[in-house]
Amino acid sequence: MNQTQNTTVNTQLEKTLPSFSIVYETENLSSVELDNIYRSLASISQQEISPEQANEFLIIDAGNAPPEVIEELCSKYPWLTVEKATNIGYYEAKMLGAKLVTGEIVVFCDSDCEYTPNWLKDILSTFLKGPEVKVVAGETSTAIRNIYELAIASNYFFPRFSRKEEPYPTTSYFLNAVAFRREFLLENPIPTNLPLYRGNCQLHCYYLCKLKGHQIWKHPLARAKHEPPTSSFIFWRSLLAGRDRIYRQYIKSIWQANPDLKDFSQVNINQEVNKNHSIKDILATTFRSPFKLRMILSVIREKPSRIFLLPLALPFILWFEILRSTGTMITYLKPNWLMETYKQKEEQESQSQEVISASPAK
């Protein structure tokens, strides 16, 4: 198909698509380099379905990007709208955006991801299957350019891209590459008042699919490339992942008993974690296999020569798992210590950055 024919097809498709809005955040820039937001928005600007067709392209700016960067981006991409929202987390930013926009479909993407040109088209066109399609995700994976990134790809939570070509039902999504029918999302919101660092999406998927019987669709050609986290960020990310896996277990058990519960602010999960546990339960939760064989095999299958580099990546993989296990053990002893310590660190770094920004240039 030549370029003229392709343009005609896309124009015809645009006429049949539901109205949509795009919600974007800056909170994830805390885990990667600032340059990522430029590459991310550049990839979105080159979509086959232009972001200018959206009712809104709304950036929820929590202050993770300098004001001059946001101003520069708004000048370059006039279809951007910015909503300032200080002291707001990742999931709160997403749900705030969903409430503010007006499209029938709300599309979520992140500042640390780059998207293939067909990404938005494939996500939106999947909704044309019928009104029963409520959630459509794309596939997200990480780049592999060195040994560290090979370790991330073999142990982090983003799998490699599948070899599928058609949309398929699934029970999971990543919030950096997913779209919802807006009314459905507002009726079944992503929980934001959970005592977790990350993992709200996992629990949202559990709620939607296991408890409520809904289905998530995934389009394998709608691909997002996620920038691997920096080595400084992965330290705390791994510790807190060990903490979060305990909390997720308790939240699931609470949800099983009360599937309609949406406000966890009154639930004292710390008290549940503090209860006496058998040594067997603690060891089973803490010490898990550090090697995710399925992920490792998919990394090698994608490029067989990586098998020779894998031994060099193993120390990183073991380090990540040691951190997770350490986070789990600390949480059994002092349930909220890790989260409180991390928040204090973040607050101190934020205050230091404000002081630097306020200092007159020499």
Enumerate the predicted regions with their spans.
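Short aromatic/hydrophobic "clamp" motif used to bind/position activated sugar donors
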Residues: V106
